[in-house]
Structure formats: structure tokens, C-alpha cells
Amino acid sequence: MRQIERDMNRAIRYRQNMSKQNTSVRCYREEIEVRLHGNLIGTVDTASNQLRIFDGGWQTVTTKSRLNALMDEFAPCMGVFQKNWEWFVSDRLTGQVVPFVSGMTV
């Protein structure tokens, strides 16, 4: 995990706003938003700790890396990967793989 991703997760954990390089975290009363280059890529519901993931319109290596860092923190058994130019989400516990859908809850 990259340093910026550790900083991102720390900011979310402690509910602190953060803006570093191309990644920002904004904390609101009931939700925390994560943005990459200004595009929404993740939200954490502070009441339920549910994580919603988005591609922000860009299915890049960096977006995937940030999403996997978020999932390491908030959905540890889940991960995003790419096969034949398509994104998928896998559950490492069950082995289930589903197509990635922007806005899905993991």
C-alpha cells in the first residue's frame, strides 16, 4: 500500500479532512467522501461503516489501487481486479466474483 493510501485511510479512520497530491478525504456528519482528481471514488457511511465504491469515470490503475486500499480498511475480504479490460470485485473468503458496478456497496 502506498503512503498516500495509508494517509487516506488514517484520515477516514480519525474522521479528518485531508488533501494530498491527487487524493482528498472530506468528512461530513454522516458520510466521508474520498476523491481522486476531484472524482468521487468512495463513500463511508459513518453510522453503518458501509463502503460504496465508484470508478469516478476512470478505470485506471491508480483508481483501482485507491479502491483496494479502502477495501483493505473497510471490507478486508474484498478486492477489485481487472481481467480482459473489465473490472471485477472478488470476495476472498467465498471466492465469489461479480462485475464491478460504480456505486456498489461492498
Question: Language-model features: where?
Answer:
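Terminal leader/tail segments of proteins
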Residues: 1-106
